[in-house]
Amino acid sequence: MNNKENDNVIIILPAKSEYVSTARLTASSVSTRAGFNIDEVEDIKVAVSEVCNMILSRTQNKISQYRISFDINTDNIKITFTAENTTLNCFEESIENEYGLYIMKALMDSVELCNEEHSIVMTKRIGV
């Protein structure tokens, strides 16, 4: 098997709900390649869907596309969501009690809703 350390896969999707399945399929492929088992891959797909849906519902047609970056490291995968020409405003307060946030936090090892780059970042460790 090839060395997967520091591989990076980036997709840019139209801000339309029809493309959430594309994000899920990409998450599945990248997570499998990174070495996650089938249950972990499913968890990652669900978490990615939740973030995509959150972005689409919270930005309310203010963006035309968003970017998802999958950073594969030897011991984890980091998934970063950013919007084009704008910031994904800190959703922390507005979704603190939202069910989707609980799902993301339950399925991933860490979830940052507002980092320095105004992105949404999720991390999952391999084999944990």
For the regions a language model picked out, list residue spans one by one.
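Conserved beta-strand-loop-beta-strand hairpin that lines the nucleotide-binding pocket
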Residues: M1-I10, M54-V128
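Bergerat-fold GHKL ATPase/HATPase_c domain
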Residues: M1-V46
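Generic alpha-helical hydrophobic packing signal
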Residues: T26, V30, D43, A47, ...
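Conserved ATP-binding N-box helix of the HATPase_c
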Residues: I38-K62
